[in-house]
Regions:
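Residues forming the flavin
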Residues: 1-220
Length: 220
């Protein structure tokens, strides 16, 4: 509503960023030090391709869940306050910030298109893939998921290949972040770690303002 109103007044709106990535699931044991001392560690990494990557929304002893975003299925996660309801896994997001330049001005639609692709490849759900399969460039299968050390907490996720979903720079950024985090919490880059995709964070348009938060219209 606000965007529509401001556009009618001829104001320039800004929103050229969207965050796209995966929900990572590993064991509580791997994340024990971070969970114990920080609960939710915040890590930021600059990938070799120039993207900014961050961790977000860590859930110790949590569960990966489906999020319905206007008909698009996305990955997300949560944890219960009651420890008796917890799982043996920790999940968190790895998100790659995509900042676009002119003439492109539809970042949210870009992320939606990538998310829909994952939905189509998983027949309406999201994809889960072992990190070891990502490194080998092959899709995960139900058999290989079951043989892994990490039991998926989201049973509706469909084994597949996130390499068919993400653009090259996005996937490379996610993998570089995973390897960097492995130095912080060894074992995270294990072949058994699970990646669910797509997770995305969308941003609203905002009016262009000066250093006093004024728009191009005097008094507004």
């Amino acid at each position: 509503w606000l965007s529509t109103l401001l556009k009618k007044r001829g104001l320039k709106m800004i929103n050229n960023q969207v965050d796209i990535g995966v929900r990572v699931e590993t064991s509580d044991i791997v994340m024990e030090e971070i969970n114990k001392h920080l609960y939710e560690g915040k890590f930021i990494f600059n990938a070799s391709v120039g993207t900014r990557v961050r961790t977000f929304c860590s859930n110790p002893s949590g569960y990966v869940v489906l999020e319905n975003h206007s008909g698009i299925m996305l990955a997300n996660g949560h944890a219960y306050s009651d420890p008796n309801l917890g799982s043996k896994n920790t999940n968190f997001a790895i998100l790659v910030s995509h900042v676009f330049s002119e003439p492109f001005d539809k970042p949210n639609e870009y992320a939606q298109a990538i998310s829909r692709l994952a939905n189509n490849l998983s027949n309406g759900s999201i994809i889960v893939q072992k990190y070891g399969d990502i490194l080998k460039g092959r899709r995960s299968t139900e058999k290989r998921i079951k043989e892994g050390f990490i039991e998926p907490t989201l049973k509706e996720a469909v084994p597949g290949d996130l390499g068919l979903v993400f653009p090259y720079n996005t996937m490379k950024s996610i993998m570089e972040m995973t390897e960097a985090l492995n130095h912080v919490t060894p074992g995270l880059a294990s072949e058994h770690t699970l990646f669910y995709g797509v997770e995305a964070k969308f941003y609203s348009e905002r009016p262009q303002v000066n250093d006093r938060f004024e728009t191009e219209i005097s008094g507004l």
